[in-house]
Amino acid sequence: MEYRIEHDSMGEVKVPADKLWAAQTERSHENFRIGVGIETMPREITHAFGILKKAAAMANAELKPEKMTAEKLAVIEKACDEVISGTLNEHFPLVVWQTGSGTQSNMNANEVIANRANELAGKKLCHPNDDINMSQSSNDTFPTAMHISAVIAIEDKLLPAIELLISTFKRLEEENEGIVKSGRTHLQDATPIKFSQEISGWRSSLERDAELLRLAVKPLHELALGGTAVGTGLNAPKGFSELVAQKVELLTGKPFVTAPNKFHSLTSKDELVFAHGAIKATACDMMKIANDVRWLASGPRDGLGEIHIPENEPGSSIMPGKVNPTQCEAVTMVAVQVMGNDVAVGMAASQGNFELNVFMPVAAYNFLQSARLLAEAIVSFNNNCAVGITANKDKMYHNLHNSLMLVTALNPYIGYENAAKTAKKAFKDGISLKEACVELGFLTAEKFDEVFHPEQMV
């Protein structure tokens, strides 16, 4: 491998000749051999850095035109666009497990953008600190990258995934409107319910989750950029905070604004905790929905067997013909991961000592993993399971008419205690509710038929 010599305030460093990073990135790459190649700083953060660095250069060009010249701005913007598009991903090797402020990832962005800008200019025009990091600090750029990436992850990936599954459930509601089945509480038989009503519960849960996510994402539109080192805005020109937020809004098409209190935005991560709570709520509902689906599909002969789900792959290496609810299992595992991530995000957010939180990379890593995994799991569950759900009408009818909880319909006619006696006798003697009720003398056979209609109990 060929190397070139780069230097920083600590001296010279050998850097691979084909890489755009420089001394500070290389030092971090050498000093933090923790999860290398596996737990790399999320690409969403890298791309957010491209957005904020471009926005900062645009703002500096207006506020400091003598320093951020048109020549510099032109090549910096092009380099940032390559970062945003992912073209330069290979030049961002740093892991999550580094300094808790994300300083080295900020410098990774500064160095790559500067060196790429210099390549585009055909000369040494831009400096990582003096130009790319102008009017900024790692302490305000990393929180800004966290918020930009979190907003994009929720609004552009997770919410569309939820809406996709909602649309599938709406279709299934319409298709199964007339089917009545046994309801269940505590995993025990309960009074009847329409299958469409059961599906509507799933759909409504996801609609509420989407509503909560839209509420929770709003505070994430506030950006720390302009607070610089400790929130005072040292070395940033007057008006930079407001202008750079406008530029981020322009680049993303999302309503980003400057945070009203930079001392808060550097040290507190409460907005991230709040938003991740909404992600966790979605995960909880997906856990419930997926569990319902796999219970209802259990069998095919010895389980509930009330619905059919797509058969996507063989389920066992030893039992021929076995097909498992694999999409349900995948989404429930993702839900567990999200719940664990919620603990990590909360713990990390609590570590805002004095003027800066120094657990930001791990908070960002877990937050973005949750949003990404849950979105992809929901899409997979929708496309490979939910769209193919069909009702086993015969099994639903059989289970419904064998349910002892239909006795609830008799309460107005024979009273709660007599209805309970009827159910217990039917269960003990292995007879129908009608036979038990008549034998106990509570109703005649004719009166039972007159008042007992399971399909009307919904």
Q: Model-flagged regions — what are they?
A:
Residues M1-V458:
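Conserved, well-structured ligand/cofactor-binding cores
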